[in-house]
Amino acid sequence: MGEVAVPGRKSIGAKRNPESADAIIEAAEAVLAEAGYSGFSIEAVARRARAGKPTIYRWWPSKAALLIEVYQRQKRLETPDTGKLEEDLAGFLVNLFAHWRDTSSGNVFRSLIAEAQSDEAAAAALADYAKGRRAHTGSMIERAKTRGEVAADVDAEIVADLIASYAWRHLLTNRLDEDETAIRTAVRYVVRGIARA
């Protein structure tokens, strides 16, 4: 079964048609807003986007993969580059906590993490996403290495995992109202541990 014909939009097979992909993501955002995570389904997205389920599954192998793309599209976070690692990481976490707290993205991401505990497709989608995030946060560490702030032998990905674990714990325990001072203290402890002697 192919995509239902929609004027001005056509399927181009396995390669994503940008117009169709946007329509599907917009439909997914709308279904998520109306039905929440528990009421979200590929069937509902397909109906709303007037697209075939096979098209959606060809482009996103699981519900979780589509939801992660929706999450990424909604995520509008500045990545600080102040010239000081402690400021960059603290600013990143403050912005992330506010984004999770003040938008539906926090609930979506929390639900994805929970689903990944029992669903292999969700776990795989989350692992792929985390790999990209690890590299993104790791780039802040690498910049600090270049500036001589951080010891050359520090593994940037491990430090990124430490920062992510702090953030995820607050997300999963619904403690996103953490005081900025506490966030800065946690970051200071991490940075002291990797600082160049």
List PLM regions with ranges:
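Short amphipathic alpha-helical segment with a characteristic S/N-K-E followed by hydrophobic residues
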Residues: 24, 39, 62-67, 76-78, ...
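C-terminal peripheral helix-coil segments that are non-catalytic and often amphipathic
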Residues: 1-9, 91, 95, 135, ...
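Hydrophobic alpha-helical connector segments
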Residues: 77-109, 159
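Hydrophobic alpha-helical segments that form the core
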Residues: 151-173, 182-192
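Amphipathic alpha-helical packing segments from all-alpha helical-bundle domains
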Residues: 107, 120-146, 181
